[in-house]
Swiss-Prot record:
The keyword Nucleus does not apply. It comes from Lactococcus lactis subsp. cremoris (strain SK11). Residues 1797-1812 have a biased composition (Gly residues). The modification Pentaglycyl murein peptidoglycan amidated threonine is found at T1930. It is a peptidoglycan-anchor. This is PIII-type proteinase. The gene is prtP.
Length: 1962
């Protein structure tokens, strides 16, 4: 209380000062300070009073010096001293023009003791108003609008003026002084001052009050002392508000008034604090936005841009160590919740490089939705520089690319404000100051200390200069140290040795620490060096380091004070480049403008957990700066006293967010490039410029007028253009009450037109002016009050300006009221399509030395998985290069290369990407991949690797369309092709790489030896002739040779010419060892040679040594070695304590021999001889001992003809251990190490204890401390003697020592891991797709380990195993938080189990019949139909080729079903074609169907032969017709060819003379020419004939009436038939009817009959029946047997009626579709009604975390959306979604019940002992089970054996009645139940996994709904992945019960998916 009273008294005493400060802008304080300093040399006091101001104002000494100018320009990044004299005079500077008249505080109008704020403001305004005439005069001189005006302590104003014009200002009447504006830095974060944030705080009192900023990042520590509000009374989000939200959302909670809401979306819990040890990214971001620290030390508190704003902790990065990325669903959930809870701004300092702008991207769509709700989105641009900067990721282009963009997604979002990074002017960093207490002071200088633990390690130590042999400062060699270094700080210079080695040597010399002096000769601090953290070390700049060396040299015995602390120092990077070198370049790949704006992001000091702070750099730091600034802007809009409040209040949605963005961009300040003559920094790098928060707020308060491009964007996007004159329009909006006129800035630098250039020396990108280019307005810019004006501008380029360049710059407009508007523009002069999408082989990016091979083919060995660069050779200069003629692989399984793929270096983002294999004629063999888009290649700094596009591999097989089988392609030349459209373009580009498929090995002949004398030495060569007719001999010329068993695996051959028949003569030099092994006789030679496809020829031959004529004995391997040990080639041990030594050789006759044993006794060798090859083999037993032996070889058995004698030593005595002890004989230990001791025999050379080499003393004793891990440790000890013989002993030691009880303390079975677990219906054994339940088992490390999953404690069994279940449903990404602890320790760690699944296969409905063959004579066949899925991604393959896919980065939790319309052409082969159509969803569930098509080329058939029954006069004539070939059908026409019908088997009965046409047709649609047959022999008017004609017409009339009444034909033709019938009846009724008239009437009526058009054509019928089958299968028996109350029929019966109607053809397709839609609407309603009825209100009104709505709302929305759809397939997809929702709701209901207390009457347990949960509600699938893994109960009315979900159509068939005729079971042993009755959908299956029977009569051979998968598949990035095993191959008809397995479960996403899932890539 005393303190409060004291504060109150101070407030009262200082009311005058405070009153002044309440209205006094910071700018006026700065102005007064500048005047005071430059006129008197004194600084402004901390408290400004009228008295001190008066004292300063009376000092009239103005000091306008060069130093003052230089200081001001330096703050703007301009080096004044580098300007020439003309530039120094022409440059503009900021000055304060002080008036002669006194300011308000001195002119007597205010009381000196007290004046109110209102009085002060009133008098100040009068003073400012009186400045008008002087301002006008000043503006005439400066040509600049006057800036800020002052009137209280200073009477004056600021302006810009050229230096040369300053004296002119002083001459103007009324001007007292002209003073250079002082560079003013507050003690707060320098970044705030860069953007004029403090001025907003002071001038407008805006600090973010009443605003909320969402921080979508890695988390916030809400307990940090700077996470506070000064006053929490008037916050936007109260605790009550948050609790209302969380009650509905069912996640998240309230933390405090500063952080009112938070949730961990990644781990699905309320832990919002980032537990990353090194740095907390989200906490740093939060501090920049809204930290509210107190205190004067900038290192110990932080004040953010909007310190009074509230922050939402939307944690989207997991605390799990398994992932450092996040995924789409997680981000989307956080974005949506941010908007729902009412965030004004959301910040995302995250992204993936080089994004696009498609709203198919779920994050971009979510950002758009947030904008539409009025939440502004601010996103970082990325930290990757340009794509042309190789591994550096900076502002460079080494490749000369036209497309260098790297702006990341979701920062590419159109509505987001995307932020680039500028460097901070100063940096708080670790700095060193070195003093001696008297004359020395070095620093403070920025350093990088090896560890924070060593801050005191250098203080008060003596220093030691390490000198080299020349007496100069050493580079730190160990030999340069002396004993004097001990205990001192060593000083060395940079170079030669690694930093690590320098540290090691200093430590080894006994030094106490190390200082490394840089060698670049500058004062640049030495940071960013790789130091180990175990030895005290830092670096110094060259300048400071040399001063230290000089001082120590003069004072070697001084102990120096070394203070290492945090300090604010100038940022060296700011002096090199105002922009951060890492900030990502724009534009978006479609030439849309990005980034939007720049903010400080380089070297920013901000908050960390636990009241900590740190320095970080990145656009991640720039983005929150803008987010905070937009909170201030939003506060200004909410200010009811703002004169424009009424306008602002009506801004909603995107109108609001776009306005905020536009105002900030219009008021931004473009940054100049200090390294290139102060030209502009490219708008593609800085956007609109550096944010000026004060200017933006000024605009909102005074004149919120704006200028935008014609499309409404606050930047002009010229796109690409080719005309040198480009017109565009700008829209000016005047929101004031007075007319405004605008003039373009007259500054030629500002308004110049620029293009991009590259510094040839450094590769740095910069902008340069385009000489002769200009932009001019088409008219004066006048904007009436409250109106808009659209003005046309023309950009003119010189005719000489080359195309394929960017054109860019800034348009600056000065308003008539002094306001300014800034607008960047950017376009591409040329054709954006033209830039290459792929780098070529050996292209611009190819740099093997740097590890970048650019675009390169990859060859793979299937067996090992090893990949090789294809065609890689070494040129004459030793450089690696790709020879495109040497790229080949083999279809031979024994070859090394079995597959080919391409690793592409994509130079651009591309869309509609397709990868094909073409044959030698350019025909497509297969399509390996089709994808919507692929990202360009770039270097990822985090993973330290290039992100290429790895296209799928081809293994040389193809789909044989003739029979549907996979075949091996023929050998030959092929092409690997990629094609795509550059994003933003419209022209497809193609890039081809030729290769060969070659399965035949080269042929080799005439293997021989040759010799040459080279340098006085005989060099032997192995020669041969070789030939390969396709891929060619190995281009690397690698070969393997063996001479007499001496091998050279690294040989190479040279070409020595070519034979007449095309063989290449090759020579391979022998190695010295091989040459020594040669003898005068039969030398065995082996040549192993491959072709480029890796087919190998291994050729053996006997060769004669050149020049030799004798055939001596040759022993292979160069003879018997001097020593035979266990490592000798040819020795083989046996089990009797010895072994056998075997050797071989050649001799022209049999060889015999003897050897001596260990006792010296002689024995015969065991020899064999092969006369055909003159080769022998001999063997001798040897014993485990050391002894000398002799071997003699003879030419005879009598041993009289000695051929060769060998002396050798047998060395097989292994070393021995004596007194070997492990852990002193104990099997257990509780220590971290155990001791292994023992003694070895004297001949032992080495002893290895595990990986440690033991030291042996003189007595051969050893002792080793061996580290052990918790659990069983097998310790191996191996002794090795000099001969290589070894002895090994081992023992298992069990250790209870565990330094980290929690490390690896939990392991899971069946492949489950912490982090993401992705699977489908068949790939995970732990998951049951029928129930959606996952059973997770595993083991803990300790009995004391505790495990909590999803907030529930998991019981641990005595054997340390555990088991628990999770309800995963059938679709979605579901994270479960995991907490692992130990009862003996007071600590835990967090992890996450995330499951990403889709357990439902897609549906596939084809319009063509899949049951009966299709015949056609058109080679172009169209496959049409529809595929649906429960998620939004589908890919389509036809005949094994990937032909279509949808946007792969989906939000799997969106609940939106997928839909794909299929319309794909296929080129038919003549004869039979089996077309396989497969659709695959996001988790590789696949459904496959086959269409069999027979095609014959169109041809003209031979005309049929027509034969009359008689040619004599007759009453009737019967015409029969025969086709010329079998399989043809003859048709006839009685109406002149208008209509045709089949000739009846009995022929055509003719009753009247006339002409009849006949033609032949076949199944393929071919026809013959029509032949006419004229009947003339009918007797006219014969009574009998007349009666016959009447009868025939009567019959035909009756038939016509029957047809009319059938209802099968459309109205038009039925009406025509009725008219023809009436006409025929009239003719029949005529009394004078003749045969001719009756015949004519008959003919006309027959024509009308023939012209009847069926209501349901055959193709429509087939398609509809297929569709009805899919619907019926989807309903299953459960839902199908329910009754539609409106009809009283079951849904199955209703579908059966539709089938009958379709079969009957009595309704049109549209009518049937309408009826089907009604049935589906009724099904949807019934299902929704059932779900809602079975859902208690407390659950139904609860929130579905995935959608944010209640379960009841989800049900209603899905029902409404489904019923609103007009398409039956869409309704089916919604039905699936509703069924999924039912599963999820049921799970929620079950979760609300007490576990294990079910009261179900039918739940049973097959294993016994378990009490089932309650019986399901009507319509539910029995799902209850007892404990201990009981089987599903039989509760519910769905069959207890629901059908499986995978099948093909190959093995099971059905007869025409739908009966199963040949069902089989892959699992075997199971007896299937009887086939279902006709019309039923077969669902029963045999025991032990038998397949479901097929059945059902819709159609006769029901198509399957899922399919098999192959062993190898490709992922979404085209990568070959390991196969998951083939699915069952028997035919299955899949039943989909309503609650059985068709659900599309939509789970909340808090999981961990890397944004690289977009890089499915990447």
């Amino acid at each position: 209380m005393q303190r409060k009273k004291k504060g109150l008294s101070i407030l009262l005493a200082g009311t005058v000062a405070l009153g002044a400060l309440a209205v006094l802008p910071v700018g006026e304080i700065q102005a007064k300070a500048a005047i005071s300093q430059q006129t008197k040399g004194s600084s402004l006091a901390n408290t400004v009073t009228a008295a001190t101001a008066k004292q300063a104002a009376t000092d009239t000494t103005a000091a306008t010096t060069n130093q003052a100018i230089a200081t001001q320009l330096a703050a703007k990044g301009i080096d004044y001293n580098k300007l020439n004299k003309v530039q120094q005079q022409d440059i503009y500077v900021d000055v304060i023009v002080q008036m002669s008249a006194a300011p308000a505080s001195e002119n007597g109008t205010l009381r000196t003791d007290y004046s109110s704020t209102a009085e002060i403001q009133q008098e100040t305004n009068k003073v400012i108003a009186a400045q008008a005439s002087v301002k006008a005069a000043v503006e005439q001189v400066t040509q600049q609008t006057a800036g800020e005006s002052y009137g209280y302590v200073v009477n004056g104003f600021s302006t810009k003026v050229r230096v040369v014009d300053i004296p002119k200002l002083k001459q103007i009447a009324g001007v007292k002084t002209v003073t250079l504006a002082k560079v003013y830095y507050p003690t707060d974060a320098k970044a705030n001052s860069m953007a004029n944030v403090q001025a907003v705080w002071s001038n407008y009192k805006y600090k973010g009050e009443g605003t909320v900023v969402s921080v979508i990042d890695s988390g916030i520590d809400p307990t940090h002392k700077d996470m506070r509000l000064s006053d929490d009374k008037d916050v936007k989000l109260t605790k009550s508000d948050v609790e209302k939200f969380t009650d509905t959302a069912k996640h998240g909670r309230y933390f405090n008034s500063k952080v009112p809401y938070g949730f961990n979306y990644a781990d699905n819990n309320d832990t919002i604090t980032d537990d990353t040890v090194d740095e907390q990214h989200g906490m740093h971001v939060a501090g920049i936005i809204g930290a509210n620290g107190t205190g004067d030390d900038p290192a110990k508190s932080v004040v953010g841009v909007a310190p009074e704003a509230q922050l939402l902790a939307m944690k989207v990065f997991t605390n799990s160590d398994t992932s450092a990325t996040t995924g789409s669903a997680t981000l989307v959930s956080a974005i949506e919740d941010s908007a729902k809870i009412g965030a004004d701004v959301l910040n995302m300092s995250l992204g993936s490089d080089s994004g696009n702008q498609t709203l198919e991207d779920p994050e971009l769509a979510a950002v758009q939705n947030a904008n539409e709700s009025g939440t502004a989105a601010v996103i970082s641009a990325g930290n990757s520089g340009t794509s042309g900067s190789a591994t550096e990721g900076v502002n460079k282009d080494y490749y000369g690319l036209q497309d260098n963009e790297m702006v990341g997604s979701p920062g590419t979002s159109r509505g987001a404000t995307t932020v680039a990074s500028a460097e901070n002017t100063d940096v708080i960093t670790q700095a060193v100051t070195i003093t001696d207490g008297t004359g020395l002071q070095l620093g403070p200088e920025t350093i990088q200390l090896s560890s924070h633990d060593f801050t005191g390690s250098f203080d008060q130590k003596k220093f030691y200069i390490v000198k080299d042999a020349s007496g100069n400062l050493s580079k730190g060699a160990l030999a340069d140290y002396t004993a004097d270094a001990k205990g001192k700080i060593a000083i060395v210079k940079r170079g030669e040795f690694s930093f690590d080695d320098k540290q090691k040597y200093a430590q080894a010399a006994g030094a106490a620490g190390l200082i490394i002096v840089n060698t670049d000769g500058t004062a640049t601090p030495m940071t960013s060096i790789a130091l180990t953290t175990t030895f005290p070390t830092f670096g110094l700049s060259s300048v400071t380091g040399q001063k230290l060396v000089d001082w120590v040299t003069a004072h070697p015995d001084d102990s120096l004070g070394v203070k290492i602390t945090l300090a604010m120092l100038p940022n060296q990077k700011y002096t090199e480049d105002k922009m951060s070198d890492f900030t990502s370049y724009g534009p978006v790949s479609n030439l849309s403008f990005k980034p939007d704006i720049t903010a400080p992001g380089g070297n920013i000091w901000s908050t960390q957990n636990n009241n900590g702070y740190t320095n970080m750099s990145g656009t991640s730091m720039a983005s929150p700066f803008i987010a905070g600034s937009q909170a201030l802007l939003k506060q200004a809009l909410n200010n009811k006293n703002n004169p424009f409040y009424a306008y602002y209040k009506q801004l909603k949605g995107t109108a609001l967010t776009d306005f905020l963005k536009t105002v900030e961009m219009n008021t931004a300040q473009p940054i100049n490039d200090i390294n290139y003559n102060n030209v502009i920094v490219s708008p593609r790098r800085q956007g609109a410029g550096l944010v000026d928060v004060k200017a933006a707020i000024d605009a909102l308060e005074k004149n919120p007028s704006t200028v935008v491009a014609e499309n409404g964007y606050p930047a002009v996007e010229l796109k690409d253009f080719t005309s040198t004159d480009k017109t565009f329009k700008l829209t000016f909006t005047n929101r004031t009450t007075h007319e405004l006129t605008y003039q373009m800035d007259s500054n030629t630098d500002t308004n110049a037109v620029y293009t991009s250039a590259t510094d040839p020396n450094s590769g740095v990108l910069y902008d340069k002016k385009i000489d002769g280019a200009a932009i001019k307005a088409g008219s004066n810019i006048t904007v009436p009050a409250g109106k808009t004006a659209q003005i046309e501008f023309t950009l003119s380029l010189p005719k000489s300006f080359d195309q394929q360049q960017f054109v860019e710059g800034f348009l600056n407009f000065k308003g008539s009221d002094g306001s300014r508007l800034n607008l960047p523009y950017m376009g591409f002069f040329g054709d954006w399509n033209d830039g290459k999408i792929v780098d070529s082989l050996n292209g611009i990016t190819y740099s093997p030395a740097g590890g970048n091979f650019g675009t390169v083919p990859l060859l793979k060995n299937k067996n090992t998985g090893t990949q090789y660069y294809g065609g890689m050779v070494t040129d004459a200069d030793g450089n690696k290069t790709v020879d495109d003629q040497a790229i080949a692989f083999s279809s031979d399984k024994n070859a090394l290369y079995n597959e080919i793929s391409m690793k592409y270096y994509l130079l651009r983002n591309i869309s509609n990407v397709q990868v094909d294999i073409l044959d030698g004629q350019g025909n497509k063999v297969t399509t390996l991949s089709s994808s919507t888009n692929r990202k360009k290649t770039y270097y990822n700094a985090h993973s330290q690797q290039y992100i290429y596009y790895n296209a799928p591999a081809w293994d040389g097989t193809y789909y044989d369309q003739r029979d549907g089988n996979i075949k091996t392609a023929d050998d030959g030349s092929y092409t690997y092709r990629i094609s795509g459209v550059p994003e933003g373009g419209d022209k497809r580009q193609v890039f081809d790489v030729p290769f060969k498929l070659d399965s035949k090995a080269p042929t080799v002949r005439h293997v021989a030896l040759s010799a040459k004398t080279e340098n006085g030495k005989t060099q032997y060569y192995l020669t041969a002739e070789a030939k390969d007719d396709l891929s060619g001999l190995d281009a690397t010329k690698s070969v393997k040779t063996e001479i007499n068993e001496v091998t050279n695996l690294d040989a190479t051959f040279t070409d020595a010419g070519t034979t007449a028949d095309g063989y290449t003569k090759i020579e391979t030099p022998l190695s010295d060892e091989q040459a020594q092994a040669l003898g005068n006789g039969d030398n065995s030679a082996e040549l192993y040679l491959t072709d480029n496809a890796s087919n190998a020829t291994d050729q053996d031959a006997s060769v004669q040594k050149p020049g030799s004529t004798s055939f001596d004995l040759i022993v292979n391997g160069g003879g018997i070695p001097d020593k035979i040990s266990s490592t000798t080639t040819g020795y083989e041990a046996n089990t009797q304590g010895g072994g056998t030594y075997t050797f071989s050789g050649t001799y022209p006759a049999a060889v015999d021999g003897t050897y001596t044993d260990a006792q010296g006794k002689k024995h015969d060798l065991n020899t064999t001889y092969d006369a055909a090859t003159n080769s022998f083999t001999a063997s001798m037993p040897v014993t485990n001992a050391d002894y000398a032996a002799q071997v003699d070889l003879y030419a005879d058995k009598a041993h009289t003809q000695l051929l060769k004698h060998f002396d050798t030593k047998v060395r097989l005595t292994a070393p021995t251990f004596t007194d070997l002890k492990f852990n002193n004989g104990s099997d257990q230990t509780s220590e971290a190490t155990i001791k292994v001791t023992g003694t070895v025999s004297a001949d032992t050379k080495t002893v290895n204890v595990g990986d440690t080499v033991a030291a042996l003393d003189a007595q051969h004793h050893f002792s080793v401390d061996v580290p052990v891990n918790y659990g069983d440790n097998t310790i191996k000890v191996t002794a090795t003697d000099e001969d290589g013989n070894t002895t090994t002993e081992q023992k298992t030691i069990t250790s209870s020592y565990d330094p980290d009880m929690l490390k690896n303390s939990v392991t899971f079975d069946q492949g489950v891991t912490f982090g993401a677990n992705e699977f489908n219906a068949t790939s995970a054994k732990f998951y049951d797709p029928k129930t959606g339940i996952a059973t997770i088992t595993g083991k803990v490390k300790h009995p004391t380990t505790t495990l909590q999953v999803d907030g529930k404690q998991i019981p641990i069994k005595d054997d340390l195993t555990f088991s628990f279940t999770l309800d995963l449903g059938t679709l979605g990404q579901k994270p479960f938080g995991v907490v692992v602890g130990d009862t003996t320790q007071n600590k835990t760690f967090q992890e996450a189990l995330t499951f990403i699944l889709d357990a439902v296969a897609p549906t596939l409905s084809l319009d063509s019949s899949t049951d009966a063959p299709v015949y056609t004579n058109d080679p172009n066949f169209q496959i049409t139909g529809t595929a649906t899925d429960n998620a939004q991604y589908l890919s389509l393959s036809i005949n094994g080729s990937s032909v279509a896919s949808q946007y792969v980065d989906i939000n799997i939790n969106s609940g939106k079903p997928g839909h794909m319309a299929i319309d794909q052409p296929v080129k038919l082969l003549e004869g039979k074609n089996v077309l396989t159509v497969a659709v695959t969803d996001s988790e590789d569930n696949t459904t496959t169907k086959n269409i069999t098509v027979y095609y014959e080329p169109k041809k003209t058939l031979a005309a049929p032969t027509v034969t009359p029954s008689t040619t004599e006069p007759a009453k009737t004539v019967t015409l029969t017709a025969n086709s010329a070939a079998t399989g043809e059908t003859v048709q006839y026409s009685a109406d002149g060819g208008k209509t045709y019908q089949d000739v009846p088997a009995a022929g055509v009965t003719v009753t009247a003379n006339g002409t009849f046409k006949f033609k032949s047709t076949d199944l393929y649609g071919n026809e013959s020419p029509a032949v006419d047959y004229v009947v003339t022999n009918i007797k006219a008017d014969d009574p009998a004939q007349l009666q016959a004609a009447k009868q025939e017409l009567t019959n035909l009339i009756a038939s016509a009436k029957t047809l009319s009444a059938s209802g099968k034909y459309d109205d038009a033709t039925t009406t025509a038939l009725a008219a023809a019938t009436q006409k025929a009846q009239t003719a029949l009724d005529q009394t004078n009817a003749s045969v001719d008239s009756l015949t004519g009437a008959n003919r006309d009526l027959q024509t009308a009959i023939n012209q009847l058009a069926a209501k349901l054509p055959a193709d429509k019928k087939t398609s509809l029946l297929n569709q009805l089958q899919s619907v019926k299968a989807a309903l299953g028996t459960d839902l199908g047997n329910q009754t539609d109350s409106s009809t009283g029929k079951t849904f199955t019966a209703a579908l059966d009626d539709l089938v009958a109607q379709a079969q009957a053809g009595t309704q049109t397709d549209d009518q049937l579709q309408a009826t089907l839609a009604k049935v589906l609407d009724a099904v949807l309603a019934k299902l929704a009604e059932g779900i809602k009825a079975a859902t208690p209100a407390e659950v139904g009104n609860a929130k579905d975390a995935a959608t944010g709505k209640t379960w009841y709302a989800d049900i209603a929305d899905t029902l409404t959306s489904g019923q609103a759809s007009a398409d039956a397939s869409d309704k089916l997809a919604h039905l699936q979604a509703l069924q999924s929702l039912k599963t999820k709701v049921a799970a929620a209901v079950e979760a609300a019940k007490t576990v294990g207390k079910g009261d179900g009457t039918t739940g049973t347990s097959d294993k016994g002992g378990g009490q089932g949960t309650p019986a399901p509600a009507p319509g539910d699938t029995g799902k209850d089970k007892g404990d201990e893994g009981s089987q599903p109960s039989s509760g519910g009315n769905i069959p207890t054996k629901p059908a499986t979900t995978t099948s093909t159509t190959t093995d099971d068939t059905t007869d025409r009645n739908g009966q199963l005729t040949s069902g089989t079971s892959d699992k075997g042993g199971g007896q299937g139940t009887p086939a279902p009755a006709p019309g039923d959908i077969g669902k029963d299956k045999g025991d032990e996994g038998s397949q479901p029977s097929s059945g059902g009569n819709i159609p006769t051979n029901p198509a399957t709904t899922t399919s098999t998968t192959t062993d190898d598949t490709t992922d979404r990035n085209g990568q070959l992945t390991s196969g998951k095993g083939a699915l069952p191959k028997t035919g299955e008809t899949t039943e989909r019960p309503a609650f059985g397995f068709l659900g599309v479960i939509v789970v909340s996403l808090m999981g961990v998916l890397g944004l690289k899932r977009k890089q499915r890539e990447e």
